[in-house]
Amino acid sequence: MIKNYGDRYHLIDKKALEDKKLDKDQLVEFVRTSGISDIGKNYNIVSIIGSQSTGKSTLLNQLFGTKFDVQNRQQSVGQTTVGIWLSKDVQNNVVVLDVEGSDSVERKSGENMVENQTALMALAMSHCFIINVFLNALGQHTSCQLSIIKIIMQQNLKLFQQDTVKHIIFVVRDWDEDANYEEASRRLNGYLLNIWNEIPKPDHYKETDFHQLFSVQVVTLVYYKMKKEFIEQTNDLHAKLSNQQDPNFIFKDFDYEKNVRWSDMPQYLSNIWEVISNNKDLNLPNEKILISNMRCQQIKLEALDGVKQLNEDLQNRVRTKLVDNFAQECQTIMNLAFKLYDKDARDYHIEVYKEKEKELKDELVNRFYTYFQKQTEQLKQHYMNTLTENLETLKRESIYNLPDKLNELDLFKLQFEEQLAKSVIQKGLWQEEDHIRYFRQQFDNQLKAFVEAQLATFKQQLDNIIKSECDKIVSSQVLNISSKFWQQIESDYYAMISEKYQKYEVLLTGLRVQQKQIEDYLNKFEEDSFHNLKQVIAVASGRFKDQLFQQFKAQFVRAPDGQPRNWQKLTEEEIFHCYTDARDKVFQLLDSLRIRKIKFIRQQVVLKKKAQTLIISSSQKVQYQISSDADSDDVVLNDVFYTQVKMQLAEDIDVQYQDAIQKHKQDFLQNIPKPFWFLLLFFMYDDVLRWMGNPLFLYPILIILCFVGFCIAIGLHSLPKLAFQWVFRTLNQAVIPIIFGGISKLKGS
């Protein structure tokens, strides 16, 4: 069965009525080949209904230049139009529907529902209805098609209330000059009003004026054989329906945006006819929204496909490197997608258009977000690598330059934020603040680790410096031990450590160390510094004996003017006086070092802790030992060490004294001839042997040897030596002068 005649199309035919669906493929072909698809949404649809064989098709052909089949009046009367035919005004954007006539003698009994379905289809499609009636039939209810309108109103009130206002034009045919126009208009409007009042309505529409849903006009046409008048009247009616410049144009306020584009009309009409033919409730806005959804979804996918290559290119680049102007490229892709979408989708339902546009944006944004995450990783990696390189360079810098350098490194965080801001298409869209916060934390952690490592290295260097300074302080006092030994060490230590403390505190603050950590660092600095001082003093205490001995020699061997003493010119009493005076001074200095302790205490001064030495005198010794922080390691010279030092010092001092005495007597002994000593040994050797055999001589010798061995065994090596020195010193002072004095007298006599 032929449906497509090129200039007209059989939209609803017997097959469509039987199958309850349209042949959408043929309709698509007709829309394409007839040029109707080119008019887009800027069109109006006009339908004509009326009794059969009343010249409806003829009237349409006269009005719009269409070529609907018309009845040959010389043949038998019958139905020409079956279902609904569709065509287009040859000059204007008006689509015309020729609807099957009512009161068909060919229609079988019980097919009124089919008539209603075709009328409802026309109503669903049309913006304006031309109801074709004859003047002599105004009193016939059926002839005026009012019964169909009643059924449509009664069953499909939602159709009117949801869509645009429908225009109804009653075309009264075969009008003559004797007819009363006002009476005809009143009667036709009265019929419609009666129908409106009779049909059931929702509560909120019970008081609604009929004219809020329908715009009704009555137009009269003379008998068609009065060609001149008939043509003039049909031209006027055509102008009302198609000429937007005509003052009586009935579609002046029409919203063309609500129209379905003719390219989508096949699907739209198929959906409508399926609903109508199955006697379902028809909801035109929903059908339009459905079509808009389908087309806008398709256009959205086409727009995404149109920017697919750009998306893939951006994705590939961001995987391998940092992309400059990332956000600008994303925006360019999005703008292009919107342009492609808007070009084909802007004529569809505005809400659907916006919804799909938002979906398009969301899909692109979601894709861009995956790229953004990779871009952010690249950005973080770039600045973290830059930070690492700069920190490697800073390792060679002085730590005192680090505070200023850290301020310079902070610029990297600002640069990261600026670059990240250039990578987002909308502030706050991709939670960039979280990325900034995480990067700052990662950046600060690496910076903190670097600072801690540098501080650890610096602390070792500082400890070495403190130890060296302490060694200088203590050594300067050890080289000249005085009664102010401890006071001077304390004073010099404080002067040195205070300067270092202040610099260290300023450095820690500049390196952004937290206040609690600063206190910990300073406490550790105080304790370690003081520990270094204690170690230096402990090591220096090993030189106390030698230094005191040197100071003894300086006082004993040299006169007050600094010149060496001439022992031969001094008497033994004078030598002994010099000896005891120098010895007592040295022992007094040694005694001042004997039980001194170094103790670490803190004093809260302007919220700063300081280390200081506490010199505890002999009277405080017991009190200190029972204190809670007493430590035996704090003692500089304990009792055993003190005894050893004093004995060794006394031994060395006595040797000096004996040496002085020997030098004093050196003249006298040198005057005795050497042969005399050989003769004395020769004549006395047998007496020596005899003495050795005498128990009174042997036993004392054995006792002395046992005493010496015992002292050596218990570690008192110097005790026998001191005893022998004392014995020989006594003999030297008492016996020898007597012997040599007698010899001198004999020589003198």
UniProtKB/Swiss-Prot annotation:
The membrane topology of this protein is: Multi-pass membrane protein
GO molecular function (one): GTP binding
Per the record, what ranges lie on the membrane's Lumenal side?
693-695
Residue spans crossing the bilayer: 672-692, 696-716
Name the Pfam families for this protein. RHD3_GTPase (PF05879), Sey1_3HB (PF20428)
Tell me which EC number(s) this protein carries: 3.6.5.-
Annotated compartments = Endoplasmic reticulum membrane
* Record PANTHER family: PROTEIN SEY1 (PTHR45923:SF2)
Name used for this protein in its record: Protein SEY1 homolog 2
The taxonomic lineage of its organism, from the top, reads: Eukaryota, Sar, Alveolata, Ciliophora, Intramacronucleata
